Amino acid sequence: MQKRICIIGGNGEMGQMTQNIFSKFLPEYALTIFDESDWQTPEQKLANQDIVILSVPIYLTDEIIKKTIPYLSEGTILADYTSIKKEPLDSMLANYDGPVVGLHPIFGPTISSPENQVIVVCDGKQQDKYQYFIDDLARIGFSIEKMTAEEHDEAMTFIQGIEHFSVYCLGLFLKHKNVDIQKMLKLASPVYKMELNIVGRLFSQGPGLYADIIMSDKQRQQTIAEFAEFVNSNAEKVSDGDKQTFIENFKAVKEWMGDFAPQSYKNTDKLLLKKKGYE
């Protein structure tokens, strides 16, 4: 039996990715795109759906959840793609009586295959009603990682918050110093060239998206502020020429990382060998 699924914000990049993946790999799902103009007559697209997924900016998520719920049919699964999970999941649970699940696709909108792409699943309520959908995602190749919303958000504070903030600051500082990027690329080692490409990749995308991600919640903002203070304290030691403290800290981190450090060296070597032709 064909399932009906509606993506609110479906004309955005992640919505378009969902449409492309489902048309190729899950043709048994009839997908409907819901965009801003559809709020004139929302019941026409939201009623009688098996699944409704919100793919909207973080700052709009709570508002859209509350705006959507009155038009859902009984038993419709309500889910979201938001890159933070606790706040939207709490909102869906508090305001909707039907099945609820939080999803976070850990990949960009340019993927052409679901193979080995990670989707985080945060259980909400009435899991027996939505488990078939999660099973279908796994069946076509997505790697499903289940965790609580709290575990997800704590991890994403570092994976997205600290990481994106660090890259943002590096790009900002390169501009501040008016660095000639093309000259740097000519002189850069493969590893540094990769790092520069990561900076360029971030700034090729929308600033609003990264503002939302980096400043998504108070915990993330506070952790980034703590990180900045930590960097400043270490920068002072470098400015003082305190090599001894630097070496001790370096050794301590290396020991703390254990096998991850040498394995990372091997992994990046393999990656660089595969991608040696990139500019």
Where do the model's predicted regions map?
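An accessory alpha-helical subdomain
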Residues: 148-279
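NAD(P)+-binding Rossmann beta1-loop-alpha1 motif at the extreme N-terminus of oxidoreductases
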Residues: 1-44
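Conserved N-terminal glycine/acidic-rich loop preference
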Residues: 2, 11-14, 50-54, 98
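Rossmann-like NAD(P)-binding element
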Residues: 44-69
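Glycine-rich, N-terminal phosphate-binding loop of Rossmann-like dinucleotide-binding domains
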Residues: 55-57, 82, 123
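ADP-ribose/adenylate-binding Rossmann-like module
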Residues: 71-87
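Rossmann-fold dinucleotide-binding core
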Residues: 85, 91-152, 156
